[in-house]
Amino acid sequence: MTMAQPRIRAVPTAATPEQPTVQLKGFTRRFGDNVVIDGLDLTIAPGEFVALLGASGSGKTTLLRTLAGLDPIGGQDVTTPDARAVVFQDARLLPWKKVWRNVALGLKDTNVRARAEAALKEVGLGHRLDAWPATLSGGEAQRTALARALVREPALLLLDEPFAALDALTRLKMHDLVLSLWREHKPAVLLVTHDVDEAIALADRVLVLDKGKIAVEERITLERPRQPDARFHAVRRRLLSRLGVEAPAPQPAPAPNSALLAFPTGEVVL
């Protein structure tokens, strides 16, 4: 879902390596006497994948809405690209429009169907162009939302807990798809999530937001695809500790003949 941007200073869609895609300097957001974001500094480089963790009420959604252009900024120093797109937890498809028309919303070219078809093929839904949204599974709906976002070639892709409502297997498949699309299209990405394992598996850098401030910044140097090995668990324990959650002890490796596979323990509810 592409957002208009009337109040935020924009940078060109193709940012240079020296020019960040996102930059906030001392950004503050209040609701009455409640300070939700408190003097926050944030920079996201072109093509960087950043994950944002934090307890409910820490300011994650407010920050994402600011970057999406949905909330006023009151003349503060916020820089984002013109080309932005958001994928929400709810796919937000229009039920009276077929799948390809949902993807093509807002496109003005004469070849909008061809562009929508290409985007849907890229997310594995080329066979569902003329389907109605009500017939899609949860995973298919989120794939459609991704296609709708990426068909516009955004310089900044904002992901607001897009996998939270999916079952575990579908979520893992969506992780692989998002990484593949990120490598292909090279947008800067900000993923808001409650799932520590998801953040470590996907991001170049993980931030923890606490009381409106960035309390933790962890650069993830593990090779992709990331496995739940000792190094993964070490990063996980550090992040959970800063989130005030006691990490469970790592599970022993399965016996050589065991049919069980070791996976991360999944979402941590904060």
Please report, for each region that a protein language model flagged, where it lies by residue:
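Hydrophobic anchor residue at the start of the ABC signature
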Residues: 146
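A short, proline-enriched helix->beta-strand linker immediately N-terminal to the Walker B motif
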Residues: 151-155
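Conserved ABC ATPase signature
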Residues: 132-136, 140
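Conserved structural motif at the start of ABC-family nucleotide-binding domains
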Residues: 22, 37-39
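The feature captures the beta-strand-to-loop junction immediately N-terminal to the Walker
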Residues: 53-55
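Helix-to-loop junction immediately C-terminal to a conserved catalytic motif
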Residues: 68
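Conserved beta-strand-loop-alpha-helix hinge in the C-terminal portion
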Residues: 211-238
